[in-house]
């Protein structure tokens, strides 16, 4: 036990005090067969310099490929200042700001974050974040069920174009809460929700409708028609959106005749790296009339007794603070550090910078699709407009193509066949603002070579 800071004399004195001969006597009740006999094949310890050299040698084995994968996690440029600021001790090691008078900096940052999310989504109030996009959507569904007092069925319509992992998360969370989830089919020519299937439920008791924009395939849904349908059917509408797209597209608060009721999504594109799947954060915003049913924490601005502006945890109807049965959520925390990075990211870029990022993503993906669909055996799978990722169809087995692309140093996309069997040999590709013309040209050239092998 070399990590224990006792000198040999300290150890001897303590052993004598308890009548033990040596340290091993402390473990004599453990059978010898269960005692540690030393790790096998573990080399002797090395010093720091040797360790750094070994780490460098191992790091050189990594392959830094060009990434064209999206599917819910996107490679964006993150200004160096974002994590330089977010890593300051005041943010990095701070705990939940329960003591408002000692946490004004953190509280103001969260308040500014909420304001920015409301500006992006066109809504009136935002919470201080959720775990990730999937849990944010699941919580939004639960919130919608609580809000819809007219509905007696707890039936929720979810577009089949919503991210498959998000739909799985919803099923997991609501399965035992007497909520029926109905998946709407999509048009296999257009790649968007089949409005005919939605209209079949007109006049029926439907509690909520979940819409994705852009959807999992990157396509742009007919959000105005779907939102208006929900309003006329007395159904709570929930929008699951990509925050980057909101710098270009109409905000959900303006969809249809009256806008949606709840907006949520994945915050990873706003300053969080693609760190093996997390940690990320989810955002959720709504109208002020619904604020009492919003999960998580909400930061408010107020004035103290001396007339000075201050910030505090205004609403936090969580199971930690009130009766569990009355809580709006049993999630006990949020993703404050990732929200800090997102707030800094949005502040640094500003509206114009966010718009430039979204525009470049859109342009790059269109250039990518144009280049790839000129290759024999490659075609665009759907006809609907798309934002910054799209589905292509190949005349060869997609897994073989992906492996050959990987061998050439290209992460070529995501194969959705595992979620949609009817989409065999299709590939979901994405090109954000970090992809260059040279990257796109390399992908197209490599894919052309791969596709030509079949006819050779």
From Swiss-Prot:
Keywords: Oxidoreductase. It is an enzyme of class 1 (oxidoreductase). Gene3D superfamilies: Aspartate Aminotransferase, domain 1, Type I PLP-dependent aspartate aminotransferase-like (Major domain). It comes from the Bacteria. GO terms for biological process: glycine decarboxylation via glycine cleavage system; nucleoside metabolic process. Its EC number is 1.4.4.2. InterPro entries: GcvPA, GDC-P_N, GDC_P, PyrdxlP-dep_Trfase, PyrdxlP-dep_Trfase_major, PyrdxlP-dep_Trfase_small. GO terms for molecular function: glycine dehydrogenase (decarboxylating) activity. Transmembrane segments: none annotated. It catalyses: N(6)-[(R)-lipoyl]-L-lysyl-[glycine-cleavage complex H protein] + glycine + H(+) = N(6)-[(R)-S(8)-aminomethyldihydrolipoyl]-L-lysyl-[glycine-cleavage complex H protein] + CO2. The keyword Oxidoreductase applies. The keyword Ribosomal protein does not apply. The glycine cleavage system is composed of four proteins: P, T, L and H. In this organism, the P 'protein' is a heterodimer of two subunits. The glycine cleavage system catalyzes the degradation of glycine. The P protein binds the alpha-amino group of glycine through its pyridoxal phosphate cofactor; CO(2) is released and the remaining methylamine moiety is then transferred to the lipoamide cofactor of the H protein. Belongs to the GcvP family. N-terminal subunit subfamily. This is Probable glycine dehydrogenase (decarboxylating) subunit 1. It comes from Legionella pneumophila subsp. pneumophila (strain Philadelphia 1 / ATCC 33152 / DSM 7513). The gene is gcvPA.
């Amino acid at each position: 036990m070399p990590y224990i800071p006792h000198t040999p004399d300290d150890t001897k004195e303590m052993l004598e005090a308890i009548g033990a001969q040596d340290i091993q006597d402390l473990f004599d009740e453990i059978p010898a067969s269960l005692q540690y006999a030393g790790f096998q094949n573990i080399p002797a310890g090395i010093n720091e310099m040797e360790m750094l050299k070994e780490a460098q040698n191992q790091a050189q084995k990594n392959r830094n490929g060009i990434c064209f994968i999206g599917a819910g996690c996107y490679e964006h440029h993150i200004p160096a200042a974002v994590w330089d600021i977010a890593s300051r001790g005041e943010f990095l090691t701070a705990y939940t700001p329960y003591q408002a008078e000692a946490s004004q900096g953190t509280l103001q940052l969260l308040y500014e974050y909420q304001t920015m999310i409301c500006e992006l989504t066109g809504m009136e109030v935002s919470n201080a974040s959720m775990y990730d996009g999937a849990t944010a959507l699941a919580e939004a569904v639960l919130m919608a069920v609580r809000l819809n007092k007219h509905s007696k069925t707890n039936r929720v319509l979810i577009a089949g174009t919503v991210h498959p992992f998000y739909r799985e998360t919803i099923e997991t969370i609501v399965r035992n809460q007497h909520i029926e989830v109905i998946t709407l089919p999509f048009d296999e020519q257009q790649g968007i929700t089949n409005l005919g299937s939605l209209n079949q439920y007109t006049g029926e008791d439907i509690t909520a409708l979940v819409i994705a924009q852009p959807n999992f395939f990157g396509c742009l849904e007919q959000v105005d028609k779907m939102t208006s349908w929900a309003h006329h059917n007395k159904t709570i509408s929930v929008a699951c959106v990509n925050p980057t797209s909101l710098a270009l597209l109409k905000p959900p608060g303006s969809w249809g005749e009256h806008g949606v009721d709840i907006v949520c999504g994945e915050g990873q594109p706003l300053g969080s790296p693609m760190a093996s799947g997390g940690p990320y954060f989810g955002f959720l915003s709504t109208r002020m009339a619904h604020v009492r049913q919003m999960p998580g924490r909400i930061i408010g601005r107020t004035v103290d007794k001396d007339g000075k502006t201050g910030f505090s945890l205004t609403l936090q109807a969580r199971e930690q603070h009130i009766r569990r049965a009355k809580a709006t959520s049993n999630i006990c925390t949020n993703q404050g550090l990732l929200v800090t990075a997102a707030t800094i990211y949005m502040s640094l870029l500003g509206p114009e910078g966010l718009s430039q990022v979204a525009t470049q993503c859109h342009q790059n993906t269109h250039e990518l699709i144009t280049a790839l669909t000129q290759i024999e055996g490659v075609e665009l799978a759907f006809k609907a407009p798309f934002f910054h990722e799209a589905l292509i169809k190949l005349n060869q087995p997609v897994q073989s193509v992906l492996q050959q692309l990987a061998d050439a140093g290209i992460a070529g996309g995501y194969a959705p066949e595992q979620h949609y069997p009817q989409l065999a040999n299709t590939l979901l590709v994405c090109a954000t603002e970090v992809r260059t013309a040279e990257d796109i040209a390399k992908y197209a050239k490599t894919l052309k070579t791969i596709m030509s092998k079949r006819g050779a």
